[in-house]
Design a protein with these regions (language model features):
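Active-site nucleophile and cofactor-binding loops and adjacent substrate-binding regions
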Residues: 86-91, 107-113, 133-136, 280-287
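Gly/Ser/Thr-rich active-site cleft segment
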Residues: 65-85, 89-93
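Short beta-strand segments
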Residues: 7, 67-71, 109, 133-139, ...
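Glycine-rich phosphate-binding loop of actin/hexokinase-like ATP-binding domains
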Residues: 126-184
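A short acidic/small-residue loop/turn micro-motif
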Residues: 31-34, 89, 158-160
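Conserved PLP phosphate-binding loop immediately N-terminal to the Schiff-base lysine helix
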Residues: 109-123
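ATP-binding/phosphotransfer module of carbohydrate and carboxylate kinases, centering on a glycine-rich
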Residues: 1-65, 75-78, 96-106, 121-128, ...
Length: 298
């Protein structure tokens, strides 16, 4: 049976059609609806996803199963979406609404869980029995995979590492709290820290690292804060879960600094006499999420 994976992102919605042996036979990307009110955005997202599924199914000569990766998660109490930074989804019955539109059951999981699943299944973490997948991009998230199965937890929030508090009086987070990990080591969080220190507004993380390498004092200090926050945040995961490996994804996973200076920033906070956990870059790139969504049926 062929499978369809859908990845609902902040800027794009991607769909793939997979064969039984996990070969991608078609891929479609469309922009995520923007600049409209929440109700209109939600309806537009439903339409976009349904249209993608219809197009992918047209090229499948057998029955398909559909998996969807999305920011946030489904409440086990209400069946409604919660904790999504695509805020138009919160409080909506996404699964039921999609199933009604396309006339079949769908499986939905948090996008970070889908990322982690794909990397554990046949990506950077395939040789390890337990994987913690970290997404560091526009936001920060995580997913726990044990023996190629998502560990979602009793409330469906396992791995929501980005909303652990790191600084009691840190920057405001969209979730209503302050000093969440996401506000400090996401791309926007890194850039905002540099700007608050007097740096050039609108600088990307790669820009800031380049400025630091060229002697910009504000950038040097901002990079040091970023790495300190990264080290403390990742160490908290290792001390609790002790995964066999950690795989980094999202735009910031392309920063080489994370794999040497970032690793060294973790070590002082590990409650052990040695730090052997591999910190790996993802193998599937920005396709990790959409592949993981398709693997929800495995």
């Amino acid at each position: 049976m062929k499978r369809i994976g859908i990845d609902l992102g902040g800027t794009k919605i991607e769909g793939v059609l997979l064969t039984q042996d996990n070969q991608v036979v078609e891929r479609i990307r469309v922009p995520t609806p923007q600049n409209i009110n929440a109700d209109q955005a939600y309806m537009a997202i439903l339409t976009s996803i349904s249209s993608l599924i219809e197009k992918l199914e047209a090229d499948a000569d057998v029955t398909t199963r559909v998996g969807i990766g999305t920011p946030g998660t489904i409440s086990s109490l209400s069946g409604l979406m919660k904790n999504s930074n695509t805020v138009c989804l919160n409080g909506k019955s996404l699964r039921a609404d999609l199933e009604q539109r396309i006339g079949k059951k769908v499986r939905i999981a948090n996008d970070a869980n889908c990322f982690a699943l794909s990397e554990a299944y046949n990506g950077a973490g395939k040789e390890y029995s337990s994987v913690f997948g970290i997404i560091m991009g526009t936001g920060v998230g995580g997913g726990i995979i044990i023996n190629n199965q998502i560990h979602a937890g009793a409330m469906g929030i396992a791995g929501e590492w980005g909303h652990n508090p790191l600084l009691a009086h840190g920057p405001d987070c969209y979730c209503g709290r302050k000093g969440c990990i996401e506000t400090l080591i996401s791309g926007p969080g890194f850039s905002a820290d540099y700007e608050r220190a007097g740096g050039t507004p609108g600088s990307s993380p790669a820009d800031i690292i380049n400025y630091a390498e060229n002697g910009d004092t504000n950038a040097i200090h901002s990079v040091e804060r970023f790495l300190n926050h990264f080290g403390r945040a990742v160490a908290s995961v290792i001390n609790i879960l002790d995964p066999h490996t950690i795989v980094l994804g999202g735009g910031l996973s392309n920063l080489d600094i994370l794999y040497h200076r970032g690793r060294r920033a973790i070590e002082p906070h590990i409650f052990s006499d040695s730090f052997t956990t591999p910190i790996l870059k993802n193998q599937h790139g920005d396709s990790s999420g959409v592949l993981g969504a398709a693997y929800l049926w495995d």
